[in-house]
């Protein structure tokens, strides 16, 4: 028998305490469940506390349920990388192409849904941090992602706990583990 549809307002009322920093995600449909056909569906709240760029080998589908978020992306095919910010407003959807470095910035009282395709067997995810001063990669970690609910958080925490990993080898700047107050402006809630 198939499970019932997930009512987002009711789920948030009963489970919003599960959306905790640094990632603030909760997998409502886990790929290990036979009912999901390998897909991962997460509810993600804000504010999150991360500055990493994640590279997934499959596309990611974003639906912004409440408020606006900012999806920071990086084109690493050029040096230095070219950065582009993509606002995703309430009620909007966005399909991020596979292998695009991205940093989802979520603000207070915002909620989104992210859906990811099943990853090919032994596909390697990458998380990396860029230097704000010179644009070089400060640190990166590659791993086979089997549980988005825990592994991304673990890598973010590993980076945050080690100043050597956070120090740019090119210029010596120490990378921040979260954006500073006022550093990133929340896009307007609704498009005018």
Swiss-Prot record:
Record's keyword annotation contains Lyase: no
GO MF annotation list: 3-hydroxyanthranilate 3,4-dioxygenase activity; ferrous iron binding
Annotated binding of Fe cation, by residue: 54, 60, 102
PANTHER family: 3-HYDROXYANTHRANILATE 3,4-DIOXYGENASE
Keyword terms, alphabetized: Cytoplasm, Dioxygenase, Iron, Metal-binding, Oxidoreductase, Pyridine nucleotide biosynthesis
EC number assigned by the record: 1.13.11.6
Claim: Glycoprotein is one of the keywords in the record: no
HAMAP family the UniProt entry points to: 3_HAO
Binding-site residues, substrate: 60, 106, 116
Pathway it works in: Cofactor biosynthesis; NAD(+) biosynthesis; quinolinate from L-kynurenine: step 3/3
Catalysed reaction, written as an equation: 3-hydroxyanthranilate + O2 = (2Z,4Z)-2-amino-3-carboxymuconate 6-semialdehyde
Family designation: Belongs to the 3-HAO family.
Pfam families: 3-HAO (PF06052)
UniProt GO BP: 'de novo' NAD biosynthetic process from L-tryptophan; anthranilate metabolic process; L-tryptophan catabolic process; quinolinate biosynthetic process
Name of protein: 3-hydroxyanthranilate 3,4-dioxygenase
Names of required cofactors: Fe(2+)
Enzyme class (EC, first level): oxidoreductase
Residues that bind a divalent metal cation: 131, 134, 168, 171
One GO CC annotation: cytoplasm
Binding site for O2: 50
NCBIfam families cross-referenced by the UniProt entry: anthran_nbaC (TIGR03037)
